[in-house]
Amino acid sequence: MYNVLVFGMTENPGGVESFLMNYYRRIDLSRFHFDFLCNSYDPVAFEDEIHAMGGRTVHFTSRRQNPIRFRKELESFFARHAHEYQAIWVNVNSLANIDYLKMAKKYGIPKRIIHSHNAQNMDSRLRGMLHEANRDAVGRYATDFWACSEYAAKWFYAGKGGRGEL
């Protein structure tokens, strides 16, 4: 069994969440197991379906709500459970927070996928600046660079020569 830790689910059943569930519904569950990291204690979109399919949802304090508690909870989870996973698949709209990739590398998850789902900053100016700062840094933590479009690859991976797999 290949165990994958997935980040990208929120309470909103939007584009990224629907993409992940479409993928999860079609994956061979006899070969792959998905667990989902959720940066909120509220139920995420499709949570009941995830559980019914055998997946687990792991909830954390939001970094925005309490950055110190977020970091402590994240560190604790990875210290206890990273050895259970062969991959982490981080699905995001910006690189403002790459803590999941950093922890995955620190605790030895061998395959670390970053997947871009956006082609421009749709958030605050601060998150835009964090995205820019992390564009070059992400190459130290991720092993694989995916994107939903050429534009998304260029916006995320400009520091990597626009490298991204569609």
Predicted regions span which residues?
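N-terminal strand-loop element at the rim of the active site
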Residues: 2, 6-14, 22-69, 163-165
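Histidine-centered beta-alpha loop that forms part of the nucleotide-sugar donor binding/catalytic region
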Residues: 8-9, 62, 91-93, 116-119, ...
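Charged helix-capping and loop-helix junction motifs
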Residues: 21, 128-134
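Short, well-ordered alpha-helical microsegments
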Residues: 43-44, 96-99, 153
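A short, histidine- and acid-enriched strand-loop-helix "catalytic/donor-clamping" loop
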Residues: 63-66, 95, 107-128, 143-144
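Mobile, glycine- and charge-enriched loop segments
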Residues: 74-91
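An aromatic- and histidine-rich active-site surface loop
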Residues: 88-110
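A short, active-site helix/loop in glycosyltransferases that binds the activated sugar's phosphate group
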Residues: 141-166
